[in-house]
Amino acid sequence: MTRFWIGVVSKEHVLRGVEGGFCQVCHGKKAPLNRMKKGDYLLYYSPKYQLNGQEKLQAFTAVGKILDDTAYQVEMFEGFVPFRRDVSYYQPVKDCPIEQVRQHPQWRQYASQIRYGHFEVSKDFFLYVFEQMKLDSPANQ
């Protein structure tokens, strides 16, 4: 059964993942990544542009499909070897501001989970956000 997830990551880091065809969540932890299975979908929510920056973004910034079966490690720099998963990202998309998503009836249920960095959402919620992100969507005409 296909499941749908949100990962909370700065936009700067999301863009690295999109460019490289991978995802990382929760500062490279393995457990959250292994909750996802091949064929699951991931939406990235970016509270800020940069991890240590002050400028807020508060938007959904990428959407993709998990391609592999398990998390693997990659050394990004000496002493930091995070886990990641391979992802096929849907492109092009536009950022979807949180204000658009707050209209969805399930938003209140998910809003409090953002602080956990990675959590499952319903297919209906996922599709609602995804539709807002697609450039060719009637929602964006």
Swiss-Prot record:
* Pfam families given in the database record: EVE (PF01878)
- Gene3D superfamilies this protein is in? ph1033 like domains (3.10.590.10)
Q: Which domain of life is it from?
A: Bacteria
Q: Which family does it belong to?
A: Belongs to the UPF0310 family.
Protein name in the entry: UPF0310 protein SSA_0254
Disulphide-bonded residues: none
**Organismal lineage:** Bacteria, Bacillati, Bacillota, Bacilli, Lactobacillales
Name its species. Answer: Streptococcus sanguinis (strain SK36)
Q: Which InterPro entries match?
A: EVE_domain, PUA-like_sf, UPF0310
